[in-house]
């Protein structure tokens, strides 16, 4: 893991818990897996605890780690560092994605509530128009009651979000996910729908699909054009889900957007999305930061303790699940 992840996730308290659960080689942290020093460490390792900044675990890394039995990830997606070779060896892989989902869900719910009231955009209008409150009437409906939220992706985050929206009893929730169980969607308080049917009904479109080749630019010019005039796009998932050129054009024409992720990230300095009053941009802050990140390291340490005790993992990742998850 990188120094930022180490400092954020492993305080002296977490390090003490780590040392109580396993025999720890010193120094405990490596930033790469190819140097002679790292290879000496790998030769002895039975478990790797990984986080942000972990290099890919390629076949040559595994050849240097004959005793490796588990890779316990103290963050969300393992896609950037887990290779097929890891699964070929039968190595256990776990994730702390459930812990990372919580702050994203909370941020997204807040964004949707802001979207109902058009709060970020009216804040920009207030700076521009000051005491002339006529601008309030220019942002369309300013209520969440009886509105429609379209959730794309009944994922860890998407499913939690649907349940929270149900509990608020404000809006109808349409869920677009071709691989999700319709009964599970209904039980969570959503209604299964196709993207084509859902988009024209969306007062808020919230994206929660994984970044896969087949989901790249799933929201393009045609999909953005299908949204109602005063709709708000919320993206706290992955920037690659949206065609950026199409998004810039749509927002330039008036589409409202709350974007915590973009493609590329960060956007070029000359992107119009920085200055449009109908766009709110945040620098990928929805996920775990600060003290939130220690919930992920705590989950990884729990997985380590369970592994040491011969108990099954709480959140295993398989080759199949990785193919359809973020």
Model-derived segments and spans:
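N-terminal glycine-/charge-rich "phosphate-binding" loop or analogous flexible N-terminal tail
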Residues: 1-47, 174, 325-326
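Alpha-helix C-terminal capping/helix-to-coil transition sites in glycosyltransferase folds
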Residues: 43-44, 64-67, 200-201, 226-229, ...
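Rossmann-like adenosine-cofactor binding region
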Residues: 56-57, 179-272
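Short beta->alpha connector loops at strand-helix junctions that form conserved
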Residues: 74-75, 92-99, 196, 284
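Phosphate-binding beta-alpha-beta segment of Rossmann-like dinucleotide-binding domains, i.e.
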Residues: 89-91, 96-148, 160-163, 168
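Glycine-rich Rossmann-fold phosphate-binding loop(s) that bind the pyrophosphate
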Residues: 154-155
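Conserved S-adenosyl-L-methionine
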Residues: 167-171, 253
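Rossmann-like dinucleotide-binding domain for NAD(H)/NADP(H)
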Residues: 230-326
